[in-house]
Amino acid sequence: IVFAKTKQAAANLSSQIADRKGSGQVVKRYCAVVRRNADVYKETETAAEYQELTDYLQRDRRTNTSYIVPKGTKGAKESKLRYAILEETEDLSLVDIELLTGRHHQIRVQLSGAGMPIAGDKKYDEKSAKTTGTREKETPALCAYSLSFQHPKTGKQMDFTVLPEGGAFEKFRKE
């Protein structure tokens, strides 16, 4: 989360967010732990090779969910993201994600739709929804780990990162 101290700074930051392709843009990166899908890996054999997903999402406010729908569906919005597989275990993968659009539950919906549901996501992954008991408090293994933008007054590049924490991320932690 970024807070502005003045109206001018808020306007500058809003402009950077709106201008995703310009210089000084706000860049927010995510990482997720996803369940491995053999079909997806045949297409992206090279680790850290970015792939782009483009889908059309429709939001259901009643159920607080979003769905992939055909292009041209009334109320659907084009949704794009880029992802790269960074590391793998036998059944999980660590994925780096860059949103090119910002839609409701976009990462969760698009990765699940591509056959790579986020570990612990009971809303968009049937397998996670069926596992209860000791994992009831498990949350989706999704983390906004990096935020970059230009300082509104000085123009200096500001970069902030965090190390993802939680059960699924621990499987990829280097000792």
Identify what each model region corresponds to.
Residues 1-175:
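RNA pseudouridine synthases
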